[in-house]
């Protein structure tokens, strides 16, 4: 009889809320976590979390030492991958909004077939909380508080992406301009579907 293998979850620790993610995973699941800063550390984990933080800073730090390529390879390997806020931006296949992405050509790791809009809900001072519906099959817990701090929004999902929850909220002025650009693309006949945000 063999002992069960210990599950080890890596948390990208270049910048952002990596310690908070570690604490939540360890308390909530009992799984071991490690902070991931180098490509070598990816060899010893069963899944990875890309935490919230500042996606531009994460991208700049990750571009050193082959880390970005190693992260892309890891996410494409099929191992479990989770992105929170800035982490979701990095995992998106496409991103709009925010000068850091448009002007500086911030690279994305990709792997998640979504189009995101950075800072959809505005600046730090525009942050807010609202009730967020639980995913299908988990409604017995009721709504939970969604926290939107300079939060991105998912504007489009690929056909293989399962949407677990939706929030209807008003974008900030900058995001409204991005949405207008998408409306123009739709008018031209380009295939753009906006789901989950109004």
Regions found by a protein language model. Give the residues of each.
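Amide-donor transfer/coupling interface in amidating biosynthetic enzymes
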Residues: 1-2, 118-198
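N-terminal beta1-alpha1 cap of cysteine-dependent amidohydrolase-like domains
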Residues: 1-77, 183-191
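A structural micro-motif
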Residues: 7, 31, 79, 106-107, ...
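Short, functionally important structural connectors and interaction interfaces within domains
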Residues: 34, 50, 101-104, 108, ...
């Amino acid at each position: 009889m063999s002992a069960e293998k210990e599950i080890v979850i890596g948390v990208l620790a270049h910048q952002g809320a990596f310690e908070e993610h570690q604490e939540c995973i360890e308390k909530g699941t009992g799984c071991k976590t490690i902070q991931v800063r180098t490509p070598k550390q990816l060899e010893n984990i069963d899944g990875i979390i890309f935490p919230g933080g500042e996606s531009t800073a994460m991208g700049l730090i990750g571009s050193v030492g082959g880390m970005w390529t190693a992260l892309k390879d890891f996410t494409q390997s099929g191992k479990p991958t989770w992105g929170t806020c800035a982490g979701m931006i990095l995992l998106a296949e496409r991103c709009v909004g925010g000068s850091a992405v448009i002007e500086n050509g911030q690279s994305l790791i990709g792997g998640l077939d979504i189009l995101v809009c950075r800072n959809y809900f505005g600046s730090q001072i525009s942050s807010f909380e609202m009730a967020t519906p639980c995913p299908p099959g988990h409604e017995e817990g009721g709504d939970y508080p969604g926290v939107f701090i300079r939060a991105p929004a998912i504007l489009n999902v690929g056909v293989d992406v399962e949407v677990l929850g939706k929030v209807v909220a008003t974008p900030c002025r900058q995001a409204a301009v991005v949405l207008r650009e998408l409306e123009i693309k739709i008018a031209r006949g380009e295939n753009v579907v906006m789901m989950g945000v109004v």
